[in-house]
């Protein structure tokens, strides 16, 4: 009986798992509820998310991964074991091969054959970090990571709304604003959204109308940092591989890649065609799940 491969994208906000032959088998928040009295974990993933904001003082919400970095190894280990057990299921006859996210896996998930001697540039904008890498022959040639990504976008929106409209909003509302009217480029017909929150001065409920142009301004510093990171990687790329990238284009993935106009902004700065892949949020897990197969061909 063949051994299955499972790829895991352990993200700042969400963790996903892909199993060969089954597809995406897990998509849960990277969050844990910890009981301080018993010193045990009460809930993980979606169950923990549902408890957020409703826990008692003897419990604590823990996000063990921040800005793409593991900040609590003990909790992360337990969370990872839980996710793996969920992904495997109870009917597994053999232990699967587990792969954790690697840059090559991102490109594989986007449908690119990284085993060929061609340069591929992938940009993964997650929740905590944005990772940029040039891949060739299933290996990383040059790469960079910047702690500016989806969560940074949300914080920028929170700050802008508080400063310019005197309104306190939560992270969930900032996420909704980003999805509904967020943009990285100027729009000929700006979109609008009614936003409710709490007046900074009076503490009473307040409603304001935001425009997509305001959100573009709020996100400008963050989007510019990502774009300049991509530009910097292109400058460090060997000429032969750079020529391949010009021909093949830039692959954009991750939840942050879904920000309207992000691909266009990168394309304008680099002069290289940029494509946001389908299923941008799950492509990392999908590709990582297939990565072991690719490496097995090389080893064999």
Please report, for each region that a protein language model flagged, where it lies by residue.
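Nucleotide/phosphate-binding catalytic cleft detector across ATP-hydrolyzing
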Residues: 1-127, 133-251, 257-300
